[in-house]
Every structure is written in C-alpha cells, then in structure tokens.
Regions:
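Mixed-charge, Lys/Arg-enriched low-complexity segments
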Residues: 48-77
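Charge-rich, low-complexity amphipathic helices
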Residues: 3, 28-32, 77
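Acidic, low-complexity, intrinsically disordered interaction modules
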Residues: 29-55
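Negatively charged, low-complexity tracts enriched in Asp/Glu with abundant Ser/Thr
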Residues: 1-17
Length: 77
C-alpha cells in the first residue's frame, strides 16, 4: 500500500485497515463530521479524530505514514 492508495481510498470515503508490527489500524470517515476516525488495536475504543491531511501526515513509530505504508500487511480498502 502506498500513500497514494490511501489518499485515493479516502477520496472515495472508503474504510481502510492495515496491520503494522502486529498492531491493527482502522481508518473510517466520521458520519457526523468531515473528519476521519483512526482506531488502533492498542486502544480499540478510543478513536483519534483527524482531518484527511492529518491522517496522511501522521506518524507511526516516529516514521511518516508514507514510509510505513509500504511495510504494512493485511491492507484492505
């Protein structure tokens, strides 16, 4: 998965999930706002609400998402 794949899926309001280092991440549009809910299996009931640009700019393990996405497994969108 690439950052372009993620951006394209988000442009179509699609849910996206992937695993990185055994941790599941799930991103879905919030029905009540123009933000996205980002869930992590470490805190499954506590989503982070972010704009699309914030999601695309977020870091995982101190690495930009664009560097993490090519390393993920089980990517679905």
């Amino acid at each position: 998965m690439t950052i372009s794949d993620l951006r394209e899926a988000m442009d179509m309001d699609m849910e996206v999930s992937f695993d990185y280092k055994g941790i599941n991440y799930f991103i879905e549009p919030d029905a009540k706002s123009d933000k996205w809910m980002v869930f992590c299996s470490l805190k499954p009931d506590v989503p982070s609400f972010m704009t699309m640009n914030e999601v695309l700019d977020m870091k995982i393990d101190d690495m930009p998402l664009k560097e993490v996405l090519p390393l993920v497994t089980n990517a679905m969108y």
